[in-house]
């Protein structure tokens, strides 16, 4: 595995790889890699000749009161995970390398961002889209891999890639969970022992809602209220949202049918966790 720290070197490498006809699987991350990231890397390894991993904590996608400085970082650990999962090139640029001068252009996302996390984090998805535009131009991937834990992000990226005719295939990968059901996340390290137990109820609430839908409930308000009530009863966390939308358009539905997403965000003392399920309802 080779570690690359400059845009120029990474572009030269990927340009030569694509010229030689090799497919490139790209996994963009903010580091502090866990089994969810490893799953993305293994999927990329299976489907491509070359695997490129980027580790970059992107300041553009953090708001003024968010956890940019607290976001966990451990490049030695990330290097080990990368090596264990078949990464060929680890792209690890500094903020100064990615944004060497005042940014004159950003990508504004006008759909799919006014709900769920986008509603709580104005400017977040503009930051995501901007850094991905740069990373796609730098790594020139054949395929790019994203976890469905950030399902809104996946929907935004798919739209952005289509709108700008970017020649990359977006590959969504199912949420990776701990054995007890908690969605793996770099932010889980902020949970206290009691909160770690309570956090299990996020996924349980989604499973209960799914069972209710499968039993025939089609009223979205009944489903979302069920989730909110369950979480408020079983945890000390604060429900940021528990919402149901069509997916990937993220538009309101009057009836639970077609492909939908049921998504939740819950604030504990030191961390905000998200989770979701997507399903197709006939």
UniProtKB/Swiss-Prot annotation:
**Could you tell me which pathway this protein works in?**
Cofactor biosynthesis; (R)-pantothenate biosynthesis; (R)-pantothenate from (R)-pantoate and beta-alanine: step 1/1
Q: What is its EC number?
A: 6.3.2.1
* Keyword Methyltransferase applies: no
Q: Which UniProt keywords apply?
A: ATP-binding, Cytoplasm, Ligase, Nucleotide-binding, Pantothenate biosynthesis
Cellular component GO terms held in the UniProt record = cytosol
Q: Name one GO biological process term.
A: pantothenate biosynthetic process
For ATP, which residues are the binding ones? Answer: 30-37, 147-150, 176, 184-187
Q: Which reaction does it catalyse?
A: (R)-pantoate + beta-alanine + ATP = (R)-pantothenate + AMP + diphosphate + H(+)
Enumerate the residues binding (R)-pantoate: 61, 153
User: Which InterPro entries does UniProt cross-reference here?
Assistant: Cyt_trans-like, Pantoate_ligase, Pantoate_ligase_C, Rossmann-like_a/b/a_fold
Tell me the compartments it is located in.
Answer: Cytoplasm
Q: Which residues form the active site?
A: 37 (proton donor)
A Pfam family this chain is assigned to: Pantoate_ligase
Where does it mainly reside?
A: cytoplasm
Q: Name one GO molecular function term.
A: pantoate-beta-alanine ligase activity
What HAMAP family does the entry give? PanC
Cite the record's note on assembly. Homodimer.
Outline what the protein does: Catalyzes the condensation of pantoate with beta-alanine in an ATP-dependent reaction via a pantoyl-adenylate intermediate.
Q: Which family does it belong to?
A: Belongs to the pantothenate synthetase family.
What other remark does the UniProt record contain for this protein? Answer: The reaction proceeds by a bi uni uni bi ping pong mechanism.
Indicate what this protein is called per its UniProt record.
Pantothenate synthetase
The gene that this protein is the product of is panC
